[in-house]
């Protein structure tokens, strides 16, 4: 018999080989559960293990919005792209950051201003844009949409909502810096760096005057080249270009910024198509067909953007512009999905619709101003008729120049300074200039106005736009009307006076139609003693004879009027006047006979068909006057006596 302690120790030890084998099998099962279950699943399936597992990838977390940052920008490049006179021209000038002096060009009463390092702040901006925004991908879509007449329809997967580092439009210094980037600047370099061709070599024989035509882009970059700003400036702006205006820019701008091709407006507008079918009724299909020729300012802006982004492929791009350059900046921002800040820009919602730019799902293609997340901010003031969309009246500067600026809506948000209410300004085109905006608006106000979204704005509200299948034809016919009149006037003046001729002989020949009654009238007046205000003695005899002959045909009548003045007045008129009117007989066999009146007493003159007193008729003294002065006083009588005052 074993001791008790020995028995307790042996109780915890396994002396059977079968038990050892079972423990090893259980250990292997614990280490490899899944393979063994799969191997023996045909005998005892386990419902919890064979359930399907969701293998879809986990969606990536949304990136954190960029943090606000400070940027210091300097001018790096100047790009110049021709538009109408030199459409193939594309040149670039590099600006050395250390040796160059950048100056703001003088404008009227504003002198030159040196531009140094420009500071700006960035803040998160939400933009709904295409996922693939490369110009090589977007440009063919825009060209196809313009040819088809409607925007391209893309799937929702092609769009993305991004938080990008855009300009802080609540910061005053940032707004002023961006306005200086959009202004007209020039560079003075010690080495006199010249322009270099970016695209095809430009014809050097046409190298004179090219800088006055086209769209110019000033490229600013920060210290790390992580953010660049493209400032667009039209050197030959199609709205206020003066002597450089051509027909082409009026055609393009009136297609984009007018309701119906500059029709039914002031006579000064340059009409560019015939799409109006009635009073404020326009065939929009006709307008789209007229738009197939690409706007050269928009084309120049896209090519300039492509070259700049190729030079800075990983940089964050901001676009700024003024006036027409501001409108082009906004269109580029809608095309490529970049933040935009404009100053006094022409309302561009109407051309954005007609260009057929890509739109996200759920947006109205006929109202681009209803898109909320565009990243565009339009800064302006209430005294600028171009910005507020009122530069289209009969006396407006735009209308006088032939431009129909009827668009009134901006895409994105509007930041409006109320200069009319706050400063008492009057609406005028002089407040549109960028130097006026910088000096008298941006720097004068302490705060930047709130930028508001205005989706309720509507362009061309009084027009009825309709689509058609393109089979309508418009026929306009007119009947030419010709009116001719032949008139002969023969005049011989023998005694000129202060106001006209004192003696006048006139002969008039014309066509007339006879009636059944004719009444010739002869009036003869002879003055022997003229006075200061008329004739002191005046005798007038009027004799009328009427002959009635029924004539039913049309005849030709010749009227002859003869006037002879023997005693001209001292200051004007004639003291004796004899007028004779003869009405010729019609061209028929019937002849009219004038019967002479019977003889009258000597106190009354004898009437006759033609009465012309002899030259040098004597006055009451019985003397004849042989010559008179220019004011009517007789200076020479017969008999050799001197001048006599006959008053």
From Swiss-Prot:
Family: Belongs to the AB hydrolase superfamily. Lipase family.
Known glycosylation sites: 203, 225, 283, 307, 469
Function recorded in the entry: Lipase which is essential for lysis of subvacuolar cytoplasm to vacuole targeted bodies and intravacuolar autophagic bodies. Involved in the lysis of intravacuolar multivesicular body (MVB) vesicles. The intravacuolar membrane disintegration by atg15 is critical to life span extension.
Origin species: Neurospora crassa (strain ATCC 24698 / 74-OR23-1A / CBS 708.71 / DSM 1257 / FGSC 987)
Topology in membrane: Single-pass type II membrane protein
Gene3D superfamilies named among the record's database cross-references: alpha/beta hydrolase (3.40.50.1820)
Cellular component terms per the entry's GO annotation: membrane; multivesicular body membrane; vacuolar lumen
Lineage of source species: Eukaryota, Fungi, Dikarya, Ascomycota, Pezizomycotina
Localization annotation: Endosome, Multivesicular body membrane; Prevacuolar compartment membrane
Lumenal topological domain residue ranges: 40-647
Disulfide bond annotation, renumbered to this chain: none
Region (Disordered): 597-626
Example GO molecular function: phospholipase activity
Alphabetic keyword roster: Autophagy, Endosome, Glycoprotein, Hydrolase, Lipid degradation, Lipid metabolism, Membrane, Signal-anchor, Transmembrane, Transmembrane helix
Subunit structure comment from the entry: Binds to both phosphatidylinositol (PI) and phosphatidylinositol 3,5-bisphosphate (PIP2).
Record-annotated active site: 323
EC number assigned by the record: 3.1.1.3
InterPro entries: AB_hydrolase_fold, ATG15_Lipase, Fungal_lipase-type
The protein's name in its UniProt record: Putative lipase atg15
Positions of transmembrane segments: 19-39
Alphabetized PANTHER family for the sequence: LIPASE ATG15-RELATED
Segments in the Cytoplasmic topological domain: 1-18
């Amino acid at each position: 018999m074993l001791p008790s302690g020995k028995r307790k120790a042996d109780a915890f030890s396994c002396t059977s080989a079968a038990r050892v084998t079972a423990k090893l099998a259980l250990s292997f099962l614990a280490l490899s559960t899944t393979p063994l279950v799969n191997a023996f699943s045909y005998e005892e399936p386990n419902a919890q293990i064979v359930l399907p597992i969701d293998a879809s990838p986990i969606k990536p977390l949304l990136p954190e919005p960029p943090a606000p940052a400070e940027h210091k920008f300097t001018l790096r490049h100047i790009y110049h792209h021709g538009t109408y006179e030199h459409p193939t021209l594309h040149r670039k000038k590099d600006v050395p950051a250390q040796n160059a002096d950048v100056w703001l060009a003088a404008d009227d009463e504003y002198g030159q201003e040196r531009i140094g390092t420009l500071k700006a702040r960035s803040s998160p901006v939400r933009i709904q844009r295409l996922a693939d925004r490369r110009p090589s991908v977007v440009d063919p879509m825009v060209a196809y949409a313009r040819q088809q007449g409607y925007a391209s329809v893309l799937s929702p997967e092609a769009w993305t909502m991004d938080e990008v580092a855009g300009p802080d439009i609540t910061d005053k210094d940032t707004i002023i810096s961006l306005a200086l980037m959009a202004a007209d600047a020039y560079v003075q370099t010690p080495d006199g760096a010249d322009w270099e061709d970016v695209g095809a070599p430009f014809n050097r024989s046409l190298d004179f005057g090219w800088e006055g035509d086209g769209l110019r882009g000033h490229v600013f970059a920060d210290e790390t080249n992580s953010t660049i700003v493209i400032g667009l400036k039209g050197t030959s702006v199609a709205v206020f270009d003066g002597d450089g205006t051509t027909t082409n820019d009026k055609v393009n701008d009136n297609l984009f910024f007018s309701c119906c091709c500059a029709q039914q407006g002031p006579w000064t507008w340059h009409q560019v198509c015939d799409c109006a079918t009635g009073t404020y009724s326009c065939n929009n299909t006709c307008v789209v067909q007229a738009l197939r020729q690409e706007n050269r300012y928009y084309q120049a802006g896209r090519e300039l953007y492509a070259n700049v982004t190729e030079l800075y492929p990983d940089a964050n791009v901001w676009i700024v512009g003024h006036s027409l350059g501001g409108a082009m900046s906004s269109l580029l921002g809608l095309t490529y999905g970049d933040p935009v800040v404009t100053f006094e820009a022409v309302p561009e919602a109407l051309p954005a619709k007609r260009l057929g730019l890509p739109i996200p799902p759920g947006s109205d293609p006929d109202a681009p101003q209803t898109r909320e997340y565009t990243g565009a901010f339009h800064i302006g003031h209430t005294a600028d008729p171009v910005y507020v969309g009122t530069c289209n009246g009969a006396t407006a500067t735009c209308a006088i120049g032939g431009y129909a600026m009827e668009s009134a809506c901006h895409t994105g948000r509007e930041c409006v300074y109320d200069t009319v209410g706050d400063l008492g300004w009057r609406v005028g085109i002089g407040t549109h200039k960028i130097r006026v905006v910088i000096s008298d608006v941006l720097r004068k106000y302490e705060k930047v106005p709130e930028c508001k979204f205005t989706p309720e704005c509507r362009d061309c509200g009084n027009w009825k736009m309709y689509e058609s299948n393109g089979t309508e034809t418009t026929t306009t016919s007119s009947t030419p009307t010709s009116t001719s009149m032949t008139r002969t006037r023969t005049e011989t003046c023998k005694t000129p006076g202060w106001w006209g001729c004192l003696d006048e002989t006139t002969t008039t020949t014309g066509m007339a139609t006879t009636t059944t009654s004719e009444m010739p009238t002869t009036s003869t007046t002879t003055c022997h003693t003229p006075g200061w205000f008329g004739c002191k003695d005046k005798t007038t005899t009027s004799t009328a004879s009427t002959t009635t002959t029924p004539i039913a045909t049309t005849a030709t009548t010749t009227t002859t009027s003869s006037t002879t003045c023997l005693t001209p007045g001292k200051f004007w008129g004639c003291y004796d006047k004899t007028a004779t009117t003869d009405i010729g007989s019609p061209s028929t066999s019937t002849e009219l006979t004038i019967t002479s009146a019977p003889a009258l007493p000597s106190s009354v003159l004898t009437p006759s068909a033609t009465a012309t007193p002899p030259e040098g008729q004597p006055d009451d003294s019985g003397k004849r006057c042989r010559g008179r002065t220019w004011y009517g006083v007789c200076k020479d009588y017969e008999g050799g006596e001197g001048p006599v005052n006959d008053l």
